[in-house]
């Protein structure tokens, strides 16, 4: 029981720390709520398989990546995404295809982990100003950066990682 409580507190601490790195704490909590809303709706919907869909939200902009088996499922996913509280924009990067293979899933995880580590280590990039998702070797980046220089630095880092097929940016440049 104590172990469960400690793990829950540690998880909550990490979530709050992640929120604190965002430019706007209220938007971070709103993003967490929107993410939970949408995941709850998708979990309850047994008509489509959403197992290969990644949901990434940043300041009310919800990015959907991954694969769906049917166009009907993709449309339903987008419809549900707009219903989540706090969502101002839905970015559809869903591919209609068979689900990602186990090997490709491991490769995507390796790319994502490498990218996050390199972004955190880079002095020119503020890692808390964006989020990433990787699907089938394609890196998707969403967030806000204060300059084109920081944006280009982040994109160059993503492109430099072995196994990356393409980098898709949904970044906004918003000077301080």
Features from the language model and the residues they span:
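N-terminal targeting leaders
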Residues: 2-176
């Amino acid at each position: 029981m104590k172990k469960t409580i400690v793990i829950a507190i540690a998880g909550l601490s990490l979530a709050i720390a992640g929120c604190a790195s965002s430019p706007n704490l209220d938007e971070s909590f709103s993003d967490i709520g929107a993410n939970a809303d949408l995941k709850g709706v998708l979990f309850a919907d047994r008509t489509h398989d959403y197992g290969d869909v990644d949901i990434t939200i940043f300041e009310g902009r919800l990015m959907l990546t991954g694969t769906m088996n049917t166009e009907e499922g993709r449309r339903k996913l987008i419809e549900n995404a707009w219903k989540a509280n706090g969502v101002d924009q839905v970015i559809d990067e869903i591919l209609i295809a068979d689900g990602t293979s186990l090997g490709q899933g491991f490769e995507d995880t390796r790319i994502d982990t490498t990218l996050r580590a390199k972004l955190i280590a880079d002095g020119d990039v503020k890692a808390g100003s964006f989020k990433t998702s990787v699907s089938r070797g394609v890196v998707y980046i969403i967030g806000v950066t204060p300059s084109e220089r920081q944006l280009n630095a982040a994109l160059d880092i993503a492109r430099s990682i072995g196994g990356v097929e393409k980098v898709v940016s949904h970044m906004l440049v918003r000077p301080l």
